[in-house]
Each structure stands twice: as C-alpha cells, then as structure tokens.
Amino acid sequence: MHLCNNQLLDHLDCNAVYRGYVSQENKVKRRKRLFNAIRKLWNERRRYRMPKDESISPTPISYSFRSLRRGHTSGHASEHTSSSRSSHDESDSMSSSSESDSDSVSSESNPKSYSDSSTSSARSSSTSGSISLYDDYYPAYSSNAPNTAISNYVSSGLSYYGNSSIIMNAVEYNQFFPLTITTLIVKNNKNVVSNLPKNVSFYFHSDNTVLLNEYYKSLSKLKNNFRGIIYKTTPYGSCNDTESLQVDTKGSVWFRDVSNMGSSGLIAFAPFDYCAPMHVLQAVQDRAKAILFYNASTASNSLTNFDHFEDAVDMITFETLPMALISYENGIAFEKILNEYSASSLNSVQDGGALVEYFGNIDATARLGVIISKEPKLLGLYIFIGVLLGLIGVIGLFICLHFSGAMNGFYRLLNRHGIPVQERIVNIGPNKPENRVTKEMLDTLPVRMFSGPHLANPNDELVYEKDWKLDKSESFDGQGNVVTTAERGSKYFDQRECTICLCEYSEESPLYRELPCHHIFHPACIDPYLLKNSDLCPLCKQSVTNMLENASEDNV
C-alpha cells in the first residue's frame, strides 16, 4: 500500500513528506512546507482517530536523520537512508522507488506485526523502514547537537509520529535539556546523601532530554533544576497497558525503599504508555519533585497515548510537576540499573567493591540520583553575554569616576579662588543667554599699573582676594589718564600673568584692567572679549554686569 493512499496523509504533498525532496523548490521552502504539513496533520489528529479493529489503521510515520556531512548515516536507518538517497539522486527512478519503500513501511509498521510477548521484535520493526530526511532538511542548524538528538531518539524507539512531533518541536525551538544520573550513598544512621566521583561508580549524562511540560503547556512556573533520588512508580489504580514496551525486571527501587529519604527529594521513573497519566497521579501522591518517563509506546498506540496523556493530566500538574522524556533504549538501561541498585547492602550493588574501598565498610545504601536542568544549551552564550555586559559596566563606571574626579579638581580650583560652585553652575547654565559688557560699563573698570609680585610670608594669615582693599595711588583710566593705583600687600595672592595671552606683566606691558571679581588681564586681551563675546570672567565665570549692578546697589 502506498503511503500516500493513507487517509491520514491524503491532504499532504507526499513528495515533500516521503522523499524530503522537491526538485523545483529551494531548501527553505521545502523545510517550511514539511513543517507546516506535519503541524496540520497533528492539529487534525482527533478528527481521524479510529478504533484499533478498523481495516485502515493510522500508519506510523518514523523519521531518521542524516548528518549535515553528506554520506554520514545516523542510527539504525542506514540501509533505508542509502536507498532513499539513491532515489534522490536518480530523478528518473524516484516514483518507483518511493512506491516500493512506502509499501515496506506500511507492512512493517502495521500494528498486527507487533507481539505483546516479544518486545525486541517490536523494537526492531519500529526502527526499520523509517522515512529518511536528507541533510538539507535542517540546514539552519550549524551545531550537531540537535542532529545528534534526532539520531539518538530515532534509533532508540522514539520514532513514531506522536513522539516525533515532540522531538521536532524541541529541535525547532532548541528545547533539549541536560539530564545527569549519578550514584548516591545514603548513610542509614544519619540519612545523609553524598555524591560520588563519576569514575567510581555509575554515571550518565545526556543533553537530549525533552520536558513534556514545554510541549504541552509552559515551563514558566517550574524551577531551574530538579534533584532527587530515582525510584520506580506503580501506576495509580493498578493500570495495566498490555501493549507497553516496558521490560519487567526481577527487582527495582520502589517508593517503599526511598520513602524515608523524602528530605533529599524523589524523582519518579515510569514508562510512557497508556498508563502514563496514572504514573503522574501516583508521583503527585508520593510528593515527587519530578517524573522521568522513557518511551514505551508502540507504533499502533503512540498517537493515542500522547492524546490521552494531554487530556488526562490537568493543567495545574503540567505547571507544577516537571515531566521529562528520554528514549526507550536509555529507559530500559535504567530499568536494569535500578534492579542492580535495589540491594540494601552497599557491597551488593554494581561496583560494590569499589564503593566499599572508597567509603569503607559503612552502614549505607547505594541509590541513583537524578539532576534535570531547565537551562537550555545556550546557557554558555548567556554567560558570555552576561560577562561582556558586566565588563562594559565596569569600564563605564571607571570612565564616570575618572570624569567625576576631573570635575572635582575643577571645583576645588574654583573654591580656591573663592567662587561658590553652585553660583558657577547657575551662571553657566546651558540655557542662559550670553550677555556682553557695554562700552560705558567697560570704562568704569579701572586700568592699573602692575607694581610687581610680592611673596607671602609663611606665617602670615591667609586672606582671599575678595577681602583685600585698594590703597589709592597713581593709576590710569582707559584713555591713558592717571587715576589711582593699588598694591596688594604681602599677605594676599597675586596674578603674575594674563591668563588670556599667558604673558607675564613686565615693564614692557605693565598695564592691566581689573574686573570686579579682582582678576586682572591685559586691556588689549580682556576688552574685546567683554565687548564681543561675553560678560563672564574668563577665570571664575562670574558675570561682570551682575557684579557691577550689585556694587552700585551697595553704594546706594
């Protein structure tokens, strides 16, 4: 039976789904087209749900993945992938190849070919005859991490349609999370849990764990990390799924074996099959911090199990209990490990001799501890961005402190000249218009004869320039007429040079004009500045106009 004749796929472009190749379209359009088709099929799943005894049953769609390096085949689908690739290269034989492959997929994945008593045959038939997606299917991913995740899931049992949708959703949004399982030593007398070095006993780490909460609802209310001791649950209400692919081992670590370790946290472990909602309910009653599922759904009931799980688990549980999903292959391995760690004696478990040698002959039990991290694989990028932003902040703070120190030095210079900082800020505000000194005001400013600097005695009392008084003597006005002159006593500061031209007062240029703030300049330097530029003193930035007006008011 051709895959395109299936009632579930009659509305899809079979070339896009089956071969992953349409010769006349570019890669981006092919990828979007395939994703949209699968989403449409998933949204209409309830419409096409059929009883198991119908003559036409939903055909499982399985996906294998080929690495970005052309010619590298992943998982157990190498044989089928190579045949699909040959059909991809030979356009003339594409139609006949697709028909023969689709017939093999339909016959091998038929629910009747599965046997409840033979799990291994079910696994082999579920992973064979998978539909190949070529290396141009995920060209947007430069990292091999999502590619490896798809390969691991497809080759280990998560290759049915319902499960593939979850994996593809995780690939599209990069929502794979790290899972770590280590050996813990629980001391019976103090009930203390201590971690072991991973080279001493059992250790497992995978970055390909999927959280079902992210697919069905939201992870916004969940914590970042979930830690606890793993134990196997029994489904609530004695639920039994006869089509489940789980393997019953002789022994395991049950809730009764870890019930006294609740303070360390508990992680439930269960197969994901039709009874998965009952396992969730039991985990809630056990007050577990999270539940770790491994896929145990067959091709015939995979879609039903995932629909049933979404309908049976309430929203509050989705938002409060983390539910992780790992592959069938890893789940069966953990089943066996739990069996080996079910012994109550430390030296009776796996690598017991090494544990006794490491810890000594102590009264303790070996258990498996689980750590599920919510942080995605981009955590390293987030850390790099955080460090970069922190470095930029430190550099910005250093620059601010540097300029702040420079401004403080400038303010100290103003204070040394007796100028209040607040007055200076108000006078040079950015919105304050510049005033100029008129010719009449300029003529009122005296021009004096510089009589030479006087050095101060270290024992003299310090007096600021604004406090000194003029001793009347010879001086000149703006027209060169002799008026009065003044000499500053040895106890007062003095200016030895004009701060505009930076030339010292000497016998060649002894004249200076004195502003009301007692700063002096050469008349040839200060007069054009006051008449054309501003009435602010070049040194203290005080307004000459305001100072003259205040002086006239004081005289009145």
Curated annotation (Swiss-Prot):
Please provide the Gene Ontology terms (biological process) for this protein. Answer: ubiquitin-dependent protein catabolic process
- Name recorded for this polypeptide: Uncharacterized RING finger membrane protein C15C4.06c
> Which residue ranges run through the membrane?
379-399
Name the UniProt key words of this record, in alphabetical order: Cell membrane, Ligase, Membrane, Metal-binding, Transmembrane, Transmembrane helix, Vacuole, Zinc, Zinc-finger
The record ties this protein, via PANTHER family, to:
RING ZINC FINGER-CONTAINING PROTEIN, SI:CH211-59O9.10
Q: Where is this region: Disordered?
A: 69-129
User: What SMART domains does UniProt report for this protein, alphabetically?
Assistant: RING
**Database matches in PROSITE patterns:** ZF_RING_2 (PS50089)
Q: Where are the zinc fingers (RING-type)?
A: 498-541
Q: Which organism is it from?
A: Schizosaccharomyces pombe (strain 972 / ATCC 24843) (Fission yeast)
Question: Per UniProt, what is the membrane topology?
Answer: Single-pass membrane protein; Single-pass type I membrane protein
The record's Pfam families line, in alphabetical order, gives: zf-RING_2
What InterPro entries does its record include?
RING_finger_E3_ligase, Znf_RING, Znf_RING/FYVE/PHD
Q: Which GO terms describe its molecular function?
A: ligase activity; ubiquitin protein ligase activity; zinc ion binding
One GO cellular component this record assigns the protein to is:
cell division site
Feature: compositional bias, Low complexity? 74-85, 93-129
Q: Which locations, inside or outside the cell, does it occupy?
A: Vacuole membrane; Cell membrane
